[in-house]
């Protein structure tokens, strides 16, 4: 199986879907209820505030919830495979290592991200329906603003009138960063067998804190905006932005390569903590 086959990949993806679909639906239902009750509590605790401010607080909550949910889902992509019966069946699938690897990564990246978003939309809708029926409130959804927060800045006009090159570089750096973060959590999911999300997140936070400290001490600019009092003057793209636009994709490629290399070495019996036993290499 040296060549990639979309037919084998489709069958492997279908197997991954069938093995995880029930838990996906259960988690989606649970997430929807969490969002509903959390939004109701936020609304109740901030009754004296304006609707705009309450929606802003809810938007912050669901954004953090979404990011944590996606990170946790990626970290758990090989959780079921770590169970011996599932691991044996998965390793015996009539597909190449690349096809099996991509089927798992694609499912837990796309399917779980979509379902987490749907759970947020359902929970937000339940809150609007409940408050409309009980309190007579108007229907104010947080979803449009939530979607706008992930849109590239060059797709809409800014009140600061940034140049197109500035907006494009922002989008490039953000995209590169997202791919690097995804590859980092994918590597953690492939390498670790226990406390994957916690250990990967702690390592990620340490790297970001170290990077921030280095940048702060070296005074390297990422993006700059010059103001004179309350008047916006100009903007610029710093050297660090160009460096990150090149380095982050390279680091992401290394992470994906390392993750796939570990995946190819999956054994039916391995140690308790990792999927990579360096003593056997």
What label would you give each PLM region?
Residues 1-87, 97-281:
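Hydrophobic alpha-helical transmembrane segments of membrane proteins
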